[in-house]
Amino acid sequence: MKKTNEKKIANKCQIFTPTNYVKELLDSVGYHKNIVNKTILENSCGDGNILVEIVNRYIEEAIELKFSNKKIKKGLENNIFGFEIDKNQFEKCICNLNLLVKKNGIQDVEWKIYNEDYLKSEVNIQFDFIVGNPPYITYSNLSQEERTFIKDKYETCRQGKFDYCYAFIEHSIKSLSSEGKMSYLIPSSIFKTVFGNKLREFMVKYIVEIKDYTKEKIFDNALVKSAIIIVDKKDCSEKIKYINMSNDDGLYICKKTIRKKWVFSNEFNIGKKRFGDYFKVSHVVATLLNKAYVINEDMYDEADEYYKVGKFMIEKDVIMPTATPRNMRYGKEEKIIFPYKYIDNQLIKYTEKEFKNLYPGAFSYLTKFKEDLIKRKSDKKSKWFEYGRTQALLGIKCEKLLISTIITDKVAVYRLDEACIPYAGMYISLRDEHQEYNFGFAKEILESENFMEYVKKVGINISGSSLRITSKDIEEFNF
């Protein structure tokens, strides 16, 4: 079982650091001068593209200092460390390092490169430098065994759905000497995601600089943007230097005033009234299998009391209008099978027998997807023909606004009536029907330049110029 888990992790770690970012990582901690007697670690080294640059810099300085090849060899063996969990990448790494030193007339180096999981290693050294690009594996892609191990060992991962790299960051900072420095290329979502809060609390006192690649796509297949964090154990600065690498804009952020979500701006959200005090922002329904419930306009023909979908006659009484921000944008209409009913605004669930008897057409249609519906990770009390998540159903029967969780260039807000059951985005409802601010005002606020500027600061950078926001982000906006 252990080997299987390690292989799965290894397969998910095969993203290597481009050369220009390798140099930026090393330059950021000053690994270019006075380095021959300093220890350095790369703890997820892949085929060695960072280690090759490290060794090259080491040899260059050693030659300048007139070191003999024998002395250089000894220095390489005593000062440069690496870990790589994948056997094939480990062997490539050793091969690449041997080719490099051979060009300089050095052979038979006994490298301190280990073919093992850094998080489970018993190597106990305090390093002068740690540089790297830790493996980025989401919580959902970790085995239960790995989740349990990491939760038990790392304080930043005790709660919530942590990412694998959180443990690497914690372990690395703890492995630095009292004057050690670290530079790590990390997903910039770490600064803002809710599950990264404990990690941010842990590392804020050590971070001295952040280089944020807000526009650049460093890794071809990665959805999130990246940043370099720079740690200096001996620097007790009360501020973090922040640089937006897309335009070289920089500022200093006071550590004492930094919030749970790290926002890199000294002028931020300065309005007097909180949006969430007047409007509630909620998640829409989650069917967990949209293809079973959603019927687009090209799929059906309308009859008196039915929608004909293929050979199925689905009863109109069990069909509701639906919407997504994307379909609203392009003017597309869709319907959704709604296997519930409301009586006096209370959600009523059917038994399987009731639903089959009342709506045999809809029941037969859903039965076509029964195998996939059963496989969903649904709420424990959800029946196979119901939506996977039911929480949103308790408050969604109301007039509302619809907004996307992904914002690109501008915010678009759509007005929906009480009957509409959206299945993507977030919906906004009134806190009080008699309050001074209505939906028209809310739409105006959310489509304003001020809100867009706010989104640019609180949103998580993903592909292109797109940003991901949460319901809490919207509620916390001050106008």
Regions found by a protein language model. Name each.
Residues A10-N11, I15-E24, K38, S44-V52, ...:
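Signature of N6-adenine DNA methyltransferases within the class I
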Residues H32-T39:
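Short helix-loop-beta connector
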Residues I80-E84:
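Conserved SAM-binding motif I beta-strand of class I
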Residues I106-D117:
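Conserved SAM-binding strand-loop segment of SAM-dependent methyltransferases
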Residues D409-E444:
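A short beta-sheet element
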